[in-house]
UniProtKB/Swiss-Prot annotation:
Keyword Cytoplasm (UniProt): yes
Hydrolase among keywords: yes
Residues forming the catalytic site: 80, 143, 172
Keywords: Cytoplasm, Hydrolase, Protease, Thiol protease
Name this protein carries in UniProt: Pyrrolidone-carboxylate peptidase 1
Chemical reaction(s) catalysed: Release of an N-terminal pyroglutamyl group from a polypeptide, the second amino acid generally not being Pro
Highest taxon listed in the record's lineage: Bacteria
Primary role: Removes 5-oxoproline from various penultimate amino acid residues except L-proline.
Length: 220
């Protein structure tokens, strides 16, 4: 049976919860499209998050890895297109680190594109009535850090497992309603909707070896 690894983060920036973990942990030991789901929580800490991620990949030996993170202020599920090789932290991480303009991997390429079928995922979500779009930037904080580190690891250190390429990428999710009440005017999404959206994303990733040709770009 195939195995899928889904990761999420601990709370950060003064929040009591992180919607990524609240939703991802609902998926532990579930089966989707014939695959077994394993979940792991990552620390919201530069470098340590990647150490934990790589350990989980080595332990689980997944065919697919999707990292999930909080994007407070975004109104929909956003599937990330690209990760860039830069740390530029607006706020300190959970251990007080605040790297500014440092590379994630000193000898790594400038960027990595997601290897998920990002447009098929967005299309599947929209068809199910879940607001979703493609994001052209994962930011420069730990979500981008993890996405870049994941794709670098899969491309170079862990290129193949069980005879096939391991695909990976990142999905951002909005605040939960209980977070949004503390940030007036900020959009939110119900936990049940986010959890359903992640199941759809996993199914789409497992069922589509390639992507579909629909518009997902932006003018600016």
């Amino acid at each position: 049976m195939k195995t899928v690894l889904i990761t999420a983060f601990e709370p950060f920036d003064g929040e009591a919860i992180n919607p990524s973990w609240e939703s991802v942990r609902q998926l532990q030991n579930q089966q989707l499209s014939g695959a077994h789901i394993e979940t792991r929580q990552l620390p919201c800490v530069f470098n340590t998050s990647l150490t934990c991620l790589y350990a989980a990949i080595d332990e689980i030996q997944p065919e697919l890895v999707i990292a999930v993170g909080q994007a407070g202020g975004r109104p929909d599920i956003t599937v990330e297109r690209i990760a860039i090789n830069i740390n530029d932290a607006r706020i300190p991480d959970n251990q007080g680190n605040q790297p500014i303009d440092t590379p994630i991997v000193a000898t790594g390429p400038a960027a990595y594109f997601s290897t998920l079928p990002i447009k098929a995922i967005v299309s599947g979500l929209q068809t199910a009535g879940v607001p979703a779009s493609i994001s052209q930037s994962a930011g420069t904080y730990i979500c981008n850090h993890v996405m870049y580190g994941l794709l670098h690891h899969l491309a170079l250190t862990y290129p193949k497992v069980r005879g096939g390429l391991v695909r990976g990428g990142f999905i951002h999710i909005p605040y939960l309603p209980e977070q949004a009440v503390k940030h007036p005017g900020t959009p939110s999404m119900a936990l049940e909707t986010i959890t359903m959206a992640l199941k759809i994303a996993i199914n789409q990733a497992l069922e589509n070896s390639g992507d579909i040709a629909i518009s997902g770009g932006m003018t600016h």
